[in-house]
Amino acid sequence: MGSGKVFLFSPSLLWSQTRGVRLIFLLLTLHLGNCIDKADDEDDEDLTMNKTWVLAPKIHEGDITQILNSLLQGYDNKLRPDIGVRPTVIETDVYVNSIGPVDPINMEYTIDIIFAQTWFDSRLKFNSTMKVLMLNSNMVGKIWIPDTFFRNSRKSDAHWITTPNRLLRIWSDGRVLYTLRLTINAECYLQLHNFPMDEHSCPLEFSSYGYPKNEIEYKWKKPSVEVADPKYWRLYQFAFVGLRNSTEISHTISGDYIIMTIFFDLSRRMGYFTIQTYIPCILTVVLSWVSFWINKDAVPARTSLGITTVLTMTTLSTIARKSLPKVSYVTAMDLFVSVCFIFVFAALMEYGTLHYFTSNNKGKTTRDRKLKSKTSVSPGLHAGSTLIPMNNISMPQGEDDYGYQCLEGKDCATFFCCFEDCRTGSWREGRIHIRIAKIDSYSRIFFPTAFALFNLVYWVGYLYL
């Protein structure tokens, strides 16, 4: 049944029906045997390949172990590369995963980064067909690592789940790459003079802790820092504008250190504060003007409205301050809220002034009427005497009386004549006459105009200047 067998048959066999069937069966059996032999050969080849694939890692693993043992033999991880010869150059790179949130109360922000450092260590050179050794974090403690620390960090956490998020690569020429993932709470001193229209540059500073610049030199591996998609960052009140990196030297008692800094430029979004503070303050001021259209004799209505608006402004001022640290200077929001409070308080004082002077005038009119009624009947008239109407006789009144009446207005008497009697006489000279009854009419024009001018100057000054 092998493939080398030869079958001889005569034409007479073809005419025999029985022998013809046997011949066909024989040919089919021969073909099936050839297929089985080929399948066995292919299985043998696959088995050989599988055996090679299984054995290859064992040989490779042994080579790596041998390389690592030879590199670490006599290696002192307490000494930096090229010590006593030249400074060790550290190339740094940062990939920003996310920024936020920013805490204005504690003046700090949170940032999640992948921090990479690259340097050359001639003690780690090796000769092998492998160009790079890809190692895990277990090898980190066995070689020299730069003592880089973040200078403005308040709290830093390395990620350990599910394993330490650290990476180590060693090239055959001695180049070492070390990366790790960090979450840092860094200081960011906010200047809140223009709050909530402020912009800030939050720094992230790092340098060597113990090696001055003549021992370690830091350099940026790339001219710019890479960042992830900012739309997933938890900045909330802030918008990410951009970033920039810089290098500077810090002069200290222990030496001169190279400081690497990344500045994250942020601008505050005004939407929250517009809804929570600015619009309520404006509406409260406008509401206080309603009292100018209420009858001046409606004392309870105008008084309650004025007091309510003043208390509302006090509450808004307190709420606006809760989202800020207790700074000693005036912010833009403080200025706006304070001016709104002044307008509301002035509206209340306007009615107090109006009510005071109108009440005095009513009392004076009542006294005059009583006096006239008493003098209208004279008990000592003789028969035949002529009766002269008293209303045609002007009562003697000196200029001191005018002065006394004007002085009742206290400071008002210095520049204004606050009573109708001040229209004439020497007290009228050099003074502006104000009709008390029309103070509400004046206020309806003055208060809205003054508030509109203030808003114009305020918003143009803080947004465009």
UniProtKB/Swiss-Prot annotation:
PROSITE patterns: NEUROTR_ION_CHANNEL (PS00236)
Topology feature Cytoplasmic, residues: 295-300, 350-444
Listed GO biological process terms: chemical synaptic transmission; chloride transmembrane transport; gamma-aminobutyric acid signaling pathway; inhibitory synapse assembly; synaptic transmission, GABAergic
Post-translational modification note: May be palmitoylated.
Ion transport listed as a keyword: yes
Topology class, membrane: Multi-pass membrane protein
Tissue specificity note: Expressed in brain.
Protein name: Gamma-aminobutyric acid receptor subunit gamma-1
Record note on domains: GABAARs subunits share a common topological structure: a peptide sequence made up of a long extracellular N-terminal, four transmembrane domains, intracellular or cytoplasmic domain located between the third and the fourth transmembrane domains.
Membrane-spanning intervals of the chain: 274-294, 301-320, 329-349, 445-465
Compartments where located: Postsynaptic cell membrane; Cell membrane
GO cellular component: chloride channel complex; dendrite membrane; GABA-A receptor complex; postsynapse; postsynaptic membrane; receptor complex
Signal sequence coordinates: 1-20
GO MF term set: GABA receptor binding; GABA-A receptor activity; GABA-gated chloride ion channel activity
Name of one Pfam family that matches: Neur_chan_LBD
Family statement drawn from the similarity comment of this UniProt entry: Belongs to the ligand-gated ion channel (TC 1.A.9) family. Gamma-aminobutyric acid receptor (TC 1.A.9.5) subfamily. GABRG1 sub-subfamily.
Coiled-coil region(s): none
Disulfide bonds: 188-202
InterPro entries: GABAA/Glycine_rcpt (IPR006028), GABBAg1_rcpt (IPR005438), GABRG-1/4 (IPR005437), Neur_chan_lig-bd (IPR006202), Neur_chan_lig-bd_sf (IPR036734), Neur_channel (IPR006201), Neuro-gated_channel_TM_sf (IPR036719), Neuro_actylchol_rec (IPR038050)
Residues bearing attached sugar chains per UniProt: 50, 127, 245
Catalytic activity from the UniProt record: chloride(in) = chloride(out)
Primary role: Gamma subunit of the heteropentameric ligand-gated chloride channel gated by gamma-aminobutyric acid (GABA), a major inhibitory neurotransmitter in the brain. GABA-gated chloride channels, also named GABA(A) receptors (GABAAR), consist of five subunits arranged around a central pore and contain GABA active binding site(s) located at the alpha and beta subunit interface(s). When activated by GABA, GABAARs selectively allow the flow of chloride anions across the cell membrane down their electrochemical gradient.
Keyword check for Phosphoprotein: no
Keywords (A to Z) from UniProt: Cell membrane, Chloride, Chloride channel, Disulfide bond, Glycoprotein, Ion channel, Ion transport, Lipoprotein, Membrane, Palmitate, Postsynaptic cell membrane, Signal, Synapse, Transmembrane, Transmembrane helix, Transport
NCBIfam families, per database record: LIC (TIGR00860)
Main location: membrane
